[in-house]
């Protein structure tokens, strides 16, 4: 039993990451960013984790937050979207001294009423650099703002406005110090983890924090489910920081390919049989 738990622990451990290689890769990525024509202030660093199979459990693919050691957001115009009682939450924002950060509070009914056209939704999107969403209505945001948010890769942060253990102010502070994490429906998962303006040490700490959170909370089988891990910017090539054993990876990809194969339809089976019988006659 002890061996099993030790194996599980190893599957979640960061010991597999070569820290010296990671430091070297971070330096290489930052050098690439500085040599490009783009302003360094606008470049962001992402961690990309490729798994052998999609993470099937739906609860693990819900939007979540990862608290980072080094802040990556500087927000001055946040919008808070709540289920209802817009004025109540507007008053709460002012009472807790959040009105310098949260400049607009919208209820879902108000959002539906006031922002109907694509143009109106784009104006709302472009007026704010962060969207905080009541976790009770987070599932409605893709329906109401989907394509408009997707165009600019806007990812709303879930927040529990009914939380009694933690004030709204503290929750907002945690959001500002966090990154957005949502596993994709496929096998490639990309998470923002740093800024090009941060130091190598800050990026290292943020990257390892995100990776540890993924292994512990979102990828049940840990390293055994991961094909490779890399870091990148939005436009750069992925720079690998860990790759699974080549033979094992090839074997697992083969298994996944077989599992994902679509069963043949009856018409396709009949056509296949006709083809086989035709070949047999020809050979005679």
From Swiss-Prot:
- A cellular-component GO term for this protein: nucleolus
Q: Where is this region: Disordered?
A: 264-284
Q: List localization entries.
A: Nucleus, Nucleolus
Provide the primary localization: nucleus
Q: What is one Pfam family matched by this protein?
A: Ribosomal_L1
One GO MF term: RNA binding
- Any GO BP: rRNA processing
Question: Which domain of life, per UniProt?
Answer: Eukaryota
Q: Which keywords does UniProt give here?
A: Nucleus, Ribosome biogenesis, rRNA processing
InterPro entries referenced in this protein's UniProt entry, alphabetically: Ribosomal_uL1-like, Ribosomal_uL1/biogenesis, Ribosomal_uL1_3-a/b-sand
Q: What does this protein do?
A: Involved in rRNA-processing and ribosome biosynthesis.
What is the protein's quaternary organization? Answer: Component of the 90S pre-ribosomes.
* Family to which this protein belongs: Belongs to the universal ribosomal protein uL1 family. Highly divergent.
Which protein, by its recorded name, is this? Putative ribosome biogenesis protein C306.07c
Q: Which organism is it from?
A: Schizosaccharomyces pombe (strain 972 / ATCC 24843) (Fission yeast)
- Lineage, opening ranks: Eukaryota, Fungi, Dikarya, Ascomycota, Taphrinomycotina
């Amino acid at each position: 039993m002890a061996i099993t738990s030790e194996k599980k622990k190893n599957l979640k451990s960061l010991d597999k990451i070569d820290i010296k290689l990671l430091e070297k890769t971070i330096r290489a990525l930052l050098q690439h960013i500085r040599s490009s024509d783009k302003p360094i202030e606008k470049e962001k660093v992402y961690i990309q984790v490729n798994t052998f199979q999609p993470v099937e459990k739906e609860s693990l693919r819900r939007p979540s937050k990862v608290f980072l050691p080094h802040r990556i957001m500087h927000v001055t115009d946040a919008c808070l979207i709540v289920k209802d009682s817009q004025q109540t939450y507007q008053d709460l924002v002012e009472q807790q001294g959040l009105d310098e950060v949260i400049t607009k509070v919208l209820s879902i009914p108000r959002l539906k009423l006031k922002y109907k056209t694509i143009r109106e939704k784009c104006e709302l999107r472009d007026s704010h650099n962060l969207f905080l969403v009541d976790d009770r209505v987070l599932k409605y945001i893709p329906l109401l703002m989907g394509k408009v948010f997707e165009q600019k890769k806007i990812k709303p942060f879930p927040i529990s406005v009914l939380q009694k253990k933690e004030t709204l102010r503290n929750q907002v502070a945690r959001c500002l110090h966090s990154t957005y994490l949502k596993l994709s429906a496929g096998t490639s998962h990309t998470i923002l983890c740093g800024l090009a303006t941060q130091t190598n040490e800050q990026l290292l700490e943020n990257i390892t924090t995100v990776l540890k959170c993924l292994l512990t909370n979102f990828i049940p089988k840990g390293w055994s489910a991961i094909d490779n891990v890399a870091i990148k910017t939005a436009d750069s090539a992925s720079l690998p920081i860990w790759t699974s054993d080549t033979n094992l990876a090839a074997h697992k990809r083969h298994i996944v390919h077989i599992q994902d194969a679509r069963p043949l339809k009856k018409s396709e089976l009949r056509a296949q049989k006709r083809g086989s019988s035709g070949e047999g006659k020809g050979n005679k």
